Amino acid sequence: MPTIVKTPSGTWKAVIRKTGFPTTSKTFRLKRDAEDWARSTEDEMVRGMYVKRSQAEKMLFSDAMDRYLREVTIHKRPYTQQGEKPRAATLKAHFGAYALAGITSELVAKYRDDRLAGVHRKDAKGNPQPLQPNTVRLELALLGHLFTVAIKEWGVGLVYNPVLNIRRPSPGAGRNRRLSAQEEQRLMQLIDQYSNPMLRWIVRIAVETGMRSSEITSLKVDQVDLARRVVMLKHTKNTMPRTVPLSLKASALFQEAVDNPLRPKRETHLVFFGEPGKDGKRRPYNFNKAWLEIKAKAGMSDLHFHDLRHEAVSRFVEAGLSDQEVSTISGHKSMQMLKRYTHLRAEDLVAKLDRLSDAT
């Protein structure tokens, strides 16, 4: 039987001692609440459903997320780490003051709906700015994995993962942003005028090769084989290493970058390097601020850097490369992922059918 005792401060403490379970207790303001808790907890023990929730009730989400970043995110690929940190900051801003046990499926569902509706994200005029479904989906994926790790590895007593019980937004259709000839000319003119030539090399290499920004900026000199005109990528988004062939333009750009007289050879082997950090180490060149400035000047605020990869792959298809050849260059893991480019194949077929008609 549970023991209910009155404490010197006037509250009521329920203590449960049961064979096969650790002694557990909880303090309440009212005796009735202590009795109700003791009765339901003992019932859970009898039915084999008892979960000790004390840690889940004490651990704040902000502390849990900090621990996740230290113990879990740190072991993920740099590309993933880069994406998770801002998502973690967003989740902490919303759930940070909650205990893990206080985050329910209803609360997570409201977060999902508010993010999709742009409730907490306004433009200069105060109008809601809805987020893309895939952005919210990735935030929920991080939130859900934190709860999974907390339950399975940290021993946090939670009955269920609140994210598993809600609907996730679908990724939606992939972006289909292409550069017009006028846009490309305007963009490249501004890129070429920028003070740091590394921005020019990075942007033009992206258009020529279809490489991701993280793949380009993390390159080391020994990964660039200009004699064979290839770049060897060891760490990619889909974990599969690949060798990227270089066009003549891409080779010339890499030659300039590798021969950069400002690159401190003794300090870094990075092709695209930033200023030394507080620890004296040089990390990959962070061009995000410069890229945003250039886009604004060019009047192309809707252009994402990743759209340059889409542009490059589209050009590969238009040039007549097979899906297998395109996949080898771009690193798309399956042919299914290249289906968004099938309309380009269809346009080629129309031209071929026209030529066939002219010949008959």
Where are the predicted features?
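N-terminal DNA-binding module of tyrosine recombinases/phage integrases
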Residues: 6-110, 114, 265-267
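Basic, Lys/Arg- and aromatic-enriched nucleic-acid-binding interface segment
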Residues: 10, 121-133, 137-142, 152, ...
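Short beta-strand motif preference
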Residues: 12-17, 231-233, 244-246
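Well-ordered beta-strand positions in beta-sheet-rich domains
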Residues: 24-27, 176, 230, 241-245
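Short, amphipathic alpha-helical segments that act as regulatory/interfacial helices
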Residues: 38, 42, 85-92, 140-151, ...
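C-terminal catalytic core of tyrosine-transesterase DNA break-rejoin enzymes
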Residues: 134, 152, 204, 208-215, ...
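Catalytic-site neighborhood detector that most strongly recognizes the C-terminal catalytic loop/helix
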Residues: 178, 235-239, 323, 330-355
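Active-site/catalytic core of tyrosine-dependent DNA strand-transfer enzymes
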Residues: 182, 228, 247-301
